């Protein structure tokens, strides 16, 4: 009875203790559930789809025609293709190894004679495409391929740059190339990267002989990708840079979990250098020197790429050049991507900046002819800016920022106040016609404000800063919800946004603009990776520019493409704003890699189409047109200012 009375007396205390224990157990169970979900990152393959536990991403294209009509069961994950002069049996085996998925593909010659195989590929239809920015940020991946032999890998990252990502590493055999399938103007155009396939080396199998390719799929968090490769017995290849001047010594590290093998190579000649070790490699480029290469390109433009016929309505314009025809491209077939305006304004911007740093009377005279052509032939009196003298194509917003940038730089070169006003007038025309929400490439924030201030155009300077802030406010508000323009989502919409926001922050010191840029950085960084190649290291994914600006008009990955340097500009300004010098080093890698678009005789290529084959046709080539690639050198000058 005393116990009962005692219990009753302490009932409130006991109840309180039990409630506290319950709450602690509930908290513990929640923490345990969270921890288990964080650990449960196993990779699996079911119903023609790869899944990562706890992640909703469909990492692969649907191969039943429901996502894209042209992506059918032929392209299912793991299906192989090849050309052979005999019968080959391919056996596929999958199993779980802890959290990883291990796949083995065995090619067996069961015939009585030897069989030669070539053009071997295994379809890996990663879900890398651009329906719209919102879908991209939640349900699509950027696929970074490195066909590096025994050290080959794939890093597939959420396009928003956050969360759990998918990795693939070769553990037996070799991947030496990749193909892209189902590209075309009627198959997604610029918004569909294609069906990717990983390619093995050509081989000959004797009777009874087999070849095994094995890879391991695993999850990672992005910044631990290399660590996860090493943890699983793989090799990471790394150099401090991938473009070297002749006479320099390259240092390449081949890193595994046990040790690092360092190989040094004296770069004695220009051109490509392959540094190999035990089936893995790095691709380096030798050049005369960075500045010498730029000097040669500048001279080639002056000597070969300006229209100097006074009878031609394009007199003074800088134009495309056909390296195969060894001639100025007059564009008689009317392709808008070859017009003398548009992206070709980059030649004028480059020469103006170069002439500021290296005064040259001949160059300045050429630039004054070009400025006259733009103002009198490309533009209308109200600064409406066309793409060509014909003025028949659409009114393109991108043109305005480029032309304004050119005019502002012309003022800084010559001191002629009219050029500063022309730059201002061009941007006012842009805002009148396209509003504040247009995502231009190269809003000339720093050059424009500097030119107007030096010219004493205070009202115009203040108005332009107001305009820039109004645009930046929209960018901050939109965040990753980018509108569709010429491509539904792309590197050259997010990179210019970061670059622009950083420059507006530098002009105003208002933190909201830097914070806006910071929020975009994970998605921007997810567009490029660190493959050990001068063409791919810190180069953003682009896969349509060989079609739109090239002679062969081939869709497919372009590594490098000069607009990847917009990311270098963004990183450069972000490093200045934050003090994080790692972004400056990455910016330098990007602009160095783009020097591969320029040759020692001063010629250039608009695009290097990187896959081995596209739609079964041989690719991996430098396009014959020198078109719009000279922007890369303007960015080089910016990053190395």
Residue map of PLM features:
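Sec-dependent N-terminal signal peptides
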Residues: 25-34
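Terminal, non-catalytic domain-edge segments
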Residues: 42, 224-242, 466, 470, ...
